[in-house]
Amino acid sequence: MRRILSRVRAAVSDYGMIKDGDKIAVGVSGGKDSLMLLKVLCELKRFHSEKFELVAITLDMRFNGKDGDFSEIKKMCDEYGVEYVVKPTDLYEIISNIRKEPSPCSLCSRMRRGILHDTAKELGCNKIALGHHLDDAAETFMMNLLIESRIGCFAPVTYLSRKDITMIRPLVYVRER
């Protein structure tokens, strides 16, 4: 954990990811990357020179019309003293039954991102933290190079002017292992 925290501190410092007074929405899917991100940001909050707030947000895709069970994430957030919001969506219904997308991943990703941005803004957040790590960056770089014949990757910090919110990726120096 110390190694991960050290790398997150370095990324936060190198890219100026967190400023005093930030309210950061942490996108929490329930997977290992987003849960590690939440844990590490809670640890960082304890001793970071800049004071900031965290809110964990999960988008409930409502697979087959059923609400998801996020009780374990809720329990974790309660232990860390982090506000937890589950945002119900109809994404599964829209993509699977209404749009009948043959390759839904790209559309679903964009729609999830939009809902996450809107939810974060509704909660008064000025930043959104995502769990993309170093291996994700390398994979994105290679996919862009091989599929689109371009050199590029996501930025560790991205300001979205249309939404007036900043995306941060504090795990960008952390290997997946």
Describe every region a protein language model picked out:
Residues 1-143, 147-150, 155-156:
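ATP-dependent adenylation/nucleotidyltransferase module used to activate substrates
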Residues 143, 176-177:
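Conserved, surface-exposed functional patches that form binding/active-site neighborhoods
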